[in-house]
């Protein structure tokens, strides 16, 4: 048995809420970005992203599912021909919500919801940089270990030289009184 969603309804009834979201999604796909209240934008996001996921699949069955919601065939064609293929390599996160200043009349919190138009080049660049740094890290550790090994060898040689110098100084210091006595004699 179908159960209604919990929480407040946008527009009062379930049918009006469905109509609101269908109209908001149509406007979003038609214009790329729309300004609406913050709560409607937050509720529209999963609704619109599911439609984009259907468009990515691109089958006739998915097109018919989208046509149940969006009645404008031109918008559905745009969704399947342009928007879906654009996000083919992206796993979710097709929309962005940006909060703006409150509405002047009733001070309602407003937001802009838009389709993300940037490719994920930055995330691919970050991923490549992380892989490169992770490959360089073991090499850097090997260099650090080699430097530490050289440093320990140098420290040992330095310590040996210091010990020899101290022994030489003590030997000359011990020989010095004997040399003075020999001069006096």
UniProtKB/Swiss-Prot annotation:
The keyword Ribonucleoprotein applies. The keyword Ribosomal protein applies. Keywords: Ribonucleoprotein, Ribosomal protein. GO terms for biological process: translation. GO terms for cellular component: cytosolic large ribosomal subunit. It holds the Pfam family Ribosomal_L17. It comes from the Bacteria. GO terms for molecular function: structural constituent of ribosome. NCBIfam families: L17. Belongs to the bacterial ribosomal protein bL17 family. Part of the 50S ribosomal subunit. Contacts protein L32. This is Large ribosomal subunit protein bL17. The gene is rplQ.
